[in-house]
Amino acid sequence: MNAPLMLSPESLAKIDKAVAKYPPDRKDSAVMAALTIAQDEKGWLATETMDFVAQYLGMPPVAVYEVATFYTMYNMKPVGKYKLTICTNLPCALQGATHAAEHLKKALGIGFNETTADGCFTLKEGECMGACGDAPVLLQNNKLMLCAMSPEKIDELIGKLKTEGAK
């Protein structure tokens, strides 16, 4: 295991806290929490990082890969500083998500699963986020849900994030 790919003591402490919620013989139950913590530190989940998580939790690497590749919240390659995920499922699409997604693509100059040349933004297409009544819904960095995202609100968000990103 390459030392630069291991997690910080702070991240390991967070994983240990998640593991403690489960019976001692079920450390693997904390795999989603461990992957999230690893991704928060590294920005994405390299194979080496997933291998480390598997070893730390005492589970086969393939089981970690299955979880990481199944859920859209995990980044399998480097992403921009701001990952914007827009729901394009039918309820959101019926409330303007398709138009909002096209506006995002045009405003950022990229398509889905692409990152801007400056490394600031990555655009993703996401599954239902459970806020259909507030569509179109956008998720920023898997943490902040933004609702009723009109083209005007999208432009405002992009401007704000560009300003923050330049700091």
What is each of the regions a protein language model found here?
Residues 1-167:
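Signature of N-terminal electron-transfer/Fe-S-associated modules in redox systems
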